Each structure stands twice: as structure tokens, then as C-alpha cells.
Amino acid sequence: MECVVQGIIETQHVEALEILLQGICGVQRDRLRVHEICLKNNPNLGNVASEVRLLCDLEQPEPTWTVKHLGGAMRGAGAEQISVLVRTMVESKVSKNALRLFNALGYKLDHELLRVGFAFHFQRGAQITVTVSSVNKMLKLHATDEAVPVTPGIQLVEVTAPASSENYTEVASAVSSFCEYLAPLLHLSKPGVSTGVVPTAAAAAVSLMSDGGGTTLFSPHTTRIKTAGLAWSI
Amino acid sequence: MEGVAMQDQSQQQQQQQQQLVPPQPVAVERLNQAVVQQLNLEAVKTRAISLFKAISRILEDFDAYARTNTTPKWQDILGQYSMVNLELFNIVDEIRKVSKAFVVHPKNVNAENATILPVMLSSKLLPEMEIDDNSKREQLLLGMQNLPIPSQIEKLKSRIDMIGAACESAEKVLADTRKAYCFGTRQGPQILPTLDKGQALKIQEQENLLRAAVNSGEGLRLPGDQRQMTPALPMHLVDLLPVGDGVHTFSDASGMYMKNTPPLSSNSIGNQGNLLQASGAQLIGRSAASPSAATSATSFDNTTASPVPYANSPRSGTNMMNTPSPQQQQQQQQQQQQQQQQQRQKMMQLPHQQQLLAQQQFRQSQMQGLGQNQMSQLHDLQGQQKFQQLHGQHQMQFSQPMGHQQFQGRQLASGHVQHGIGQSQLGQGNQLNRHLSQFSGAANSALFNAAQGTSNSQMIPNMSATVSSQSLLPRMQFGLAGNNPQRSHASQMLSDQMFNMGASNPGSMMPIQQQQQQQQQQHNTQGAFGNMQPNAQNLQSNMVALQNAQQNHPNFAQQRQQNQQ
């Protein structure tokens, strides 16, 4: 299971967001370049079509493959009260033959996309991963080198944290409290719920980018304080 | 000032209490009405009460936060604090007005206040305050105590002016920065910068696009014709995917087959089932090739010239095993036979694997082509039969076209086709068999064939003859395993074709095409299908009882006897 929220940010503010995240998370950012291939199988015998995603991390020296299955989201009154989306997720590393295997099993390519950006992995109440990436589509099959952004001016911000059925409430609250830190720049919501951009984003970005906002760090602690102090000393 | 104000406030409250508490005949001291109005004591009281309430509310909130261990919403709390601040200012203003009228509460000295009054009246500072004051004064007048007083005063005045100027400039800078960063004023509501409407709409559009793309892949799916694999695959995919030249179906298929034999062959089986739906492009691209193959080889069947379809059947004169593809052929369709022969020759020239692949493709094409070829022959049958019932059975994807094919039965369902669809259609075919067996007419032979339940044994020899791939064989066996145990031998199959229908499992999956073949065989070689005619009426009446095998049994028994000649 995982808790996930998504938000958007204008490309011009991405650098400011990076600074903010660096201040809050206290870790170095990791580059992100993932080729995501979404496979769907045709239900032959009346079963439901199932979907599986193959993620190829192109940033590593050797491309590493992961297979991921996203299940249905938690439903119900309790789910509506939680501000994050809780859904089943199964993930595993696989060898590069996974694509062939799934084709043999009858899974066909449904769509593919390329995410280029950066990510932060840190621990704050839960193991949280924040990815900021531009989502690119390929005009020709598998042509990752010629990918163009789906929306050039807007990038996607995703905050995910793995959870289990016992602790998902704590993880959800950890994720949502982390998201409050990002409030000056963007709003995060459940996938599928659109948020729009935040009006204070421009001002917050300016303040983050200015020197008073803290330079990139040698001491995460002080920078955190500095950045935090400026971002909401309104 | 504050301390005095508070004292006054308490004094006033005491006064009010004194006014309220003793309604007795004791002369109540009341303020002069005019003074009361001037002082507006009520207002002060209201303000004091509201301030008290605000503070207590904040305290309660904090208490609640502490108890439930949730993070407080700082925005709200700050707002509440600012409200409290405002109220305090207001009260202080009011008190100032009130305190102008009253200096001290106990007007008369009496025993009660004799001791406390001097303390209240003294203006001498408390010792700590006094020390503080002195030190501050020293600090202030440092270096000036020697000078005469006026100069001291002047110096202090200039100092005050300088400080005042500095404060003002600081305020100015703060205000300017606030404007530049759009922070809003310190007090009062924040004026959030709003986005331009048009811009907001554009952003909203883009956001919807992006979210849809990420979450459900909208806008990322390439239409079928654009799904041509780029010749320059990225590094991580180069070893994984076959790169076809995409020029000719054959060469494509052959190239891909050579590279990915196991997945290809197993894919083919699945694809055959999907073909009728004209499934979208696959990575391997075979299915894209096969529809074109279908159109090019309309009723192609990889049969030999021999009319006998079954390899192991003792009744078949010709040995089918001499060719890799024991496809069956209709005598009635000479044209098709010729075509088949031509294509077979073509196939012979290709390497074996490619033949298989091409056969598979052609089979698939045949399935699609069957409808066209056989419609004319079986018009009457179609009129008689009730397709709806067939659809009620196992809902296979290709139930509809298969229905056609059952009743047409002409074009042979080659063994390949059978096993292509066999696994998924077995149950359906079974049901159909029962009904079809009861139709009459020469054209019913196809029906009969379709209606006949066929077993693994018949399929398997065909398969082994046609498909050398290992993966196919076990799959087929598994698929048909549940079927008629009587059908262990092909010869038995032929003889028991009619009986088979009754006894076969309703739930088992039978390849319909193969059944057609069998029936056709019988028709061709034995001419034993005339016996179906008397049963035509029965069949029609029995069509309703789809699931009821027993109704069909008598018919089957008759036919069996007739068949066994």
C-alpha cells in the first residue's frame, strides 16, 4: 500500500521548490529519469483487464527495471476524510526480461511516458519520497530520446510513502503535514483532484531564490531554519 | 499606565458589584447618571468580558490540541491572537477615558483601607523598579551628567529625533519590501495576488492534461498506425525488443519468429483468439501482420491436396503426416483448394518455422475469411438456427464469428485454427454441437461437424503434425483435457462423433473448427450425413434445451448407429 498525493507547479518555480525541499528534507536530491511502460492485458476469458507498469531507471549506469502494480484506492467514508490517497501498490525489482515476459503473458503496450526530474527520499514520520518531474511523451514508439513534455509549462510533483494496512493513518498524517510545508508554493491533492496553482507561488519562489532564502547547503540544519523562516515570515 | 488601568478596571468592577449586590435599604452608592453615561462603563464592561472570552477560547483550543495531539492550525491561532490584541487596545482606550474621571476609589479613609491606602497612593517605585530606572537613567545620561541641564535636555532631544528618524526609515523599508514581495500589510487582511482569469484557465487545462496523462495515460496512446517501432531503440530496450523492418508481413513474421520463438508461438495462440477482434498493435507486431495476411489469403488453408483431414484416422486414405500442416480442405471449394495449394507451395519453400508462423497467420485469416466464404452455402442453416442460444454459452470473444463458422463449416477449419480457438471455445462448441447435429441437409454437414464434439485425440495429431513448437502442444492438451474420455483414439472419434455430442461435458471447451472438420470428413468420405435429415425437426425443437444433453441423446444414438455404418 502507499499514500500518494499529487500537485502541479509551474516550471519556472521548480528551482525554488528544489531549494525549499532541500531545506526541509535535509538530503541531497537524486536525479530522476524513468521510462515508464504501462502494459495492459486483454481480458480473454471475461476477466477484468489488468494493468502493470514497468519502470526503467535510466539514471543508473545500468538501467534497472522495476515492475509495479497499482491497485484500487481505498474507498469509504474514512478514505474521504483522509487528505491523501491510499491505494494498494506492489513493486519489485525485475530483470530486463520483464518486458518480454509480460508480452508473452499477453500484456500489450498501452502507453508509455518518460519522467525527467529529481527526487528526494527522506524520513519524516514515514519514508517519504518527493518527485518533481516533467512528464514526457514519445511520439514514436519507445523513442525516449525524442520525448516531448506533455505540458511544457507545468511539472508534476508527487509525494508518496509506503504504508501498510496497520499504519496507513500515521503515514497519511505524516504526508499531509509534510505537504503543509510546501503550501507557499503548491497545493497537493489526491490524484484526480485538480488543484490549480497557488497564488503565492510567485512571491514564495522569489523569496526562496533570493540570497536571504538560504544558499545551498553545507549545513542542512541552518539552511532549513533560514529557508523556513523566510518562506513564511509573512 | 497599564497597571493603573487594570487597577481602575478592578475598582470599577468592584463598584459595579457594589451597585448590584446590595439592593437592601442601605443607601446604594450610585454614580451620577451623567457621569455614567460619559464614562460608558457598560461598554468597558462588555469589552472586558469579550476579551476574557477570547482569551479563554484560545486556551481551550490549545487544550484541545494538546489532548488530541493534532497540529494546530497556526493561521487560525494567529488570527485569534490578533483579535485579542485588538480588543486589548480597545479596552485600554476606554479605560483611559474612564480614568480621567476617577483617580482613586476609596474616597474616605476608614479602618478598612487605612493600611493599604498609603501604598496605593505612593508614587515611589518598587525597589526593583527603582534600581532598573536608575540604571537606565545612567545609561542614558552617560557622558552628559556634567553638562548643565538644558544641554542635557537638548542632547536627549536630538537623540530622540535620531531614533525617531531611524525608526521611520526602517518602517519605510519594511513597507517597500512588503509591497515588492506582495506580503500584504501587517495588520488587516492579506490581499492575495490573484491569477489572471485567462491564465488560470490555461493552467487548469494544462493541469488536467498532465494529471490525466500520468494517472490514466490519456493522450499518450499512439494510434495503431503510428505504432511503428522506431529503428533506433534506446539503449535499455535494444536487446529486449525485436526490430522488424516492417516491410512485408512474411518477412516480419519470420524475422520475429526466429528471434522470439517461444513467446511468439504462445502469443500466436492467444492472438488467434484475439484476432477476430483485430486486436491492436503488439510489440511483436505479429497481429498487425496477420490481418493483412488474412486479406491476401482469403480462404487460404494450408491443406494438402488430399481431401482427408485427419492424420491418424483409419478412414482417411491419405497420410496427412507428410506435410507439416495437415489442414483440411473442402472439395466443394476448388478455388480455395487451388489457392491453398499455391500457398502451400509457398509455404514449403519457406523454412519450417516460418511455415508454421505463416500457417498460424493464415489460420487466423481463415477464421476471418470463413464468414465470407461460407455464408452462401449455409443460408438455410442460418435461418434455421438460433444463434442467440449459442451466445448464451461461454462468452468467448469470438463467439459470434465462430457461430458463423460453425454453421458454415465449409472452409476447413484447419487443425491450427482449431487449436487456436480451441481452448477458449470448447464449452461453447460443445453446446452447439448438440444442436447442430440435428440439422439436416447437405449443408448441415458443416453443422454436424461443428456440432460434433471432438476430443483431444483428434486435435493432438493434427497439432503434432502442424506445430512443432513445444509450447503449443502441452497447452492444447491442457485445454482439452477435460473432454470426452472416450475420445482417446481418432478412429473412435470419427465413429463416435454423434455420440460424442451427448456425452461430452457441457463445460468443456471444444474446438469448433475441428468439429467441422470431422463432420466434413464424414461427409466427404462416408456420406453418412443423410441420416441427419430426419432429425432436423427434432433439433429445432430441441434448440431451446441448450443445456439439456439428454434430449439430444436419442438423436445422437440414432445418428451414431447410422454413422458407424
Describe these PLM feature segments.
Chain A
Residues L20-V27, L101-L105, A174-L185:
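Conserved short hydrophobic interaction patches
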Residues H35-P43, V116-F120, G192-A202:
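Short proline/glycine- and acidic-rich turn/helix-capping motifs at secondary-structure junctions
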Residues L188-I234:
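Short, highly charged C-terminal tails/helix-capping segments
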